[in-house]
């Protein structure tokens, strides 16, 4: 999920601003979602996701990708030969784009934090990348994920860092001359660990990735080095690995 980083950028480009819910936002974004060559968040999140994925067994297992979007991580997942891969997203247009890339993909349209099309204890691995903060209730979402996860299974989460939200960063994209801001809900990392523990999960790994020299060229291309200097060192994304004993 692309996030332009700073509130002022829309004003600088003369764009109006509109705040929308996740379904409307990603439906509107779907047609251009895959064209994000200079996205700072994705530049930091993608290698972190690969690090998380290397910690779990994919081959022969059932994987559920919650907030799958257009299937950004699917080439990496499918290269490790899962027994099945299910894409879940609340946006019908995003799922249409996923189907365009993977015509045989099994998909399910999420209903808020509910996954009615997925049976109890039917998955070995749940992946959620840059999606959880779009759900108003993290506790109910993680509880539902635990419902569909088998014992011995794992959950991998990446998301926009709550500290970045507190620093004024937003999840936005540009469409029709407007800056579209997609609603999101920050959950502190300690609170997220507590929720997971209450749901019967065990945290085994966590990491953060901050704005650093590796993404400086992206700020340079956007002619936004002042923002880079201001926010250098700010954690922008985090990743967590939980297991269900």
Specify the residue positions occupied by each region the protein language model found:
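Conserved class I S-adenosyl-L-methionine
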Residues: 2-57, 72-76, 94-97, 156-179, 183, 210, ...
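Class I SAM-dependent methyltransferase SAM/SAH-binding core
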Residues: 64-66, 70-114
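A short acidic, Gly/Pro-enriched loop at the edge of an enzyme's catalytic core
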Residues: 116-126
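A short SAM/SAH-binding and catalytic strip from SAM-dependent methyltransferases
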Residues: 125-138
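A short glycine-rich, Lys/Arg-flanked "PGG" loop and its adjoining helix->strand segment in the class I
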Residues: 139-151
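Short alpha-helix
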Residues: 184-206
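A C-terminal cap/extension of S-adenosyl-L-methionine-dependent methyltransferases
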Residues: 203-245
């Amino acid at each position: 999920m692309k996030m332009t980083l700073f509130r002022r950028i829309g004003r600088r480009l003369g764009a109006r601003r509109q705040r929308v819910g996740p379904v409307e936002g990603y439906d509107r974004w779907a047609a251009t979602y895959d064209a994000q060559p200079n996205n700072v968040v994705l530049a930091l999140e993608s290698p972190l996701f690969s690090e998380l994925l290397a910690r779990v067994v994919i081959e022969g297992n059932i994987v559920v990708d919650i907030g799958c979007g257009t299937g950004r991580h699917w080439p990496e997942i499918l290269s490790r030969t899962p027994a099945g891969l299910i894409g879940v997203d609340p946006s019908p247009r995003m799922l249409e784009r996923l189907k365009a890339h993977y015509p045989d993909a099994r998909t399910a349209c999420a209903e808020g934090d509910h996954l009615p099309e997925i049976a109890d204890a039917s998955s070995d691995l749940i992946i959620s990348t840059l999606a959880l903060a779009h759900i108003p209730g993290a506790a109910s979402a993680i509880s539902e994920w635990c419902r569909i996860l088998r014992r011995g299974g794992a959950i991998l989460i990446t998301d926009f860092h709550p500290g970045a939200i507190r620093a004024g960063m937003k999840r936005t994209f540009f469409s029709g001359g407007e800056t579209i801001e997609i609603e999101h809900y920050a959950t502190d990392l300690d609170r997220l660990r507590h929720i997971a523990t209450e749901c019967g999960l065990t945290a085994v790994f966590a990491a953060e990735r901050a704005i650093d020299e590796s993404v400086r060229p992206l700020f340079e291309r956007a002619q936004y080095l002042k923002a880079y200097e201001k926010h250098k060192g700010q954690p922008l994304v985090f990743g967590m690995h939980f297991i269900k004993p």
